[in-house]
Amino acid sequence: MKETIDFLIDTIEARQVLDSRGNPTVEAEVFLECGASGIAIVPSGASTGAHEAHELRDGGSKYMGKGVLSAVNKIHETISPALCGLSALDQTAVDKLMTEIDGTLNKSNLGANSILAVSLATARASANALDIPLYRYLGDPLSNLLPVPLMNVINGGAHAPNSLDFQEFMLVPHGVNNFSESLRMGTEIFHSLKSLLDQKGLSTAVGDEGGFAPNLSSSEEAGDLLLEAIQKAGFKPGEQVSLALDAASTEFYNDGIYKYEGKSLNSSEMISYLSRLVSNYPIVSIEDGLAEDDWEGWSELNKELGDKVQLVGDDLFVTNTERLRKGIMEKSANSILIKVNQIGTLTETLEAIELAKMSGFTSVISHRSGETEDTTIADLSVATRSGQIKTGSLSRSERIAKYNRLLKIEEELGNQARFAGALGLGPKNI
């Protein structure tokens, strides 16, 4: 074992780089006394919840105001001097010090993007110093569960310039024994879907997350296309491959009304609509079926559908333990979406996952629409045995990078590897 001093943080570098949408984001590199280092790049969302931690942006004319040099400077001028000399192995202390220096509830002083970049890079530096994979460093010897992928193959809403109000229509290939076969199934259906869209004269242009973005008349048309693509690829809907939705309902909600497909619906009417979809399609998961502050509606939704499908809170919970506790008390959902940049530190992310698990909620580890080549979430999904991951479609290399990382992890684990399959949708089975 190396001497403790070897794990002390020596220096931290940061720079402005680009994400998958061509927008600036923060990369941080943490160097330890022993010579090991770790790099992390933070993602950014398009449909962001009002309660998310604050990203620091420059404003002004450069990069249309989206530059992050101010966040980079915060790392160089404030975070690095404060953290140098701390043990990188004490992730909690590192993250706590950054949040204390920031001094705000939403990290608006230092910026969640600067804090998170350093937080994740610190963990990776520690793993590299110990010469172990990140999933093993963050997890334990039982961290061997590969997640079921929720593959966003039809994009709508804020993720695509088309007519669909719902943001994501996903494949859930669960009816196999390992991750690599699940990935193969999803890939074959993706190509089957592309062929179908071509045949129907529909666009095969892709959205932010690599899924197709055709102009369709309704969510039902999207669902029908997915069922046809699954069958055309030789698989059985519901038995081998199910469907999942991200309604991102906050995006079309205002003053108690959901403006959906040209109609004005109240919460009860929206719940009835979602219930019909569940009855007519093999849907196993609905994310953000209602708006982020429609707490009463969420409780009704959970009463109606909570014993039938996974109800995932994204904008509802924003990876925040306080909002999650409220949701647990009010029985508002049964699952939480985990996005590291919504809360801004690795420690708080792990706390949210643990609280969900203790409360009988599932957790779904997720990317953002503005992604990078960073593969931390792949390791995080295995480390925490979450059983599910959302990392986009089967195109765009920033999405594929996470799938490829999971393939490598499965190979490293060998016969110790387990695959969540259908079990990934129920925490009692993990």
UniProtKB/Swiss-Prot annotation:
Substrates-to-products reaction catalysed = (2R)-2-phosphoglycerate = phosphoenolpyruvate + H2O
The organism sits in which domain of life? Bacteria
Family the entry assigns: Belongs to the enolase family.
Q: What is this protein called?
A: Enolase
Gene symbol here is eno
Annotated binding of Mg(2+), by residue:
246, 287, 314
Q: Name one GO biological process term.
A: glycolytic process
Main location, first listed in the record? cytoplasm
What is the free-text note on the cofactor? Binds a second Mg(2+) ion via substrate during catalysis.
Q: In which pathway does it act?
A: Carbohydrate degradation; glycolysis; pyruvate from D-glyceraldehyde 3-phosphate: step 4/5
Tell me yes or no: is Amino-acid biosynthesis among this UniProt entry's keywords: no
The EC number(s) attached to this protein equal 4.2.1.11
Keywords on record: Cytoplasm, Glycolysis, Lyase, Magnesium, Metal-binding, Secreted
Gene Ontology cellular component terms for the protein in this record? cell surface; extracellular region; phosphopyruvate hydratase complex
Which is an annotated GO molecular function term of this record?
magnesium ion binding
* Keyword Lyase found: yes
Kindly give the SUPFAM superfamilies that the UniProt entry links to this protein: Enolase C-terminal domain-like (SSF51604), Enolase N-terminal domain-like (SSF54826)
Instruction: List, separated by semicolons, the cofactors it needs.
Output: Mg(2+)
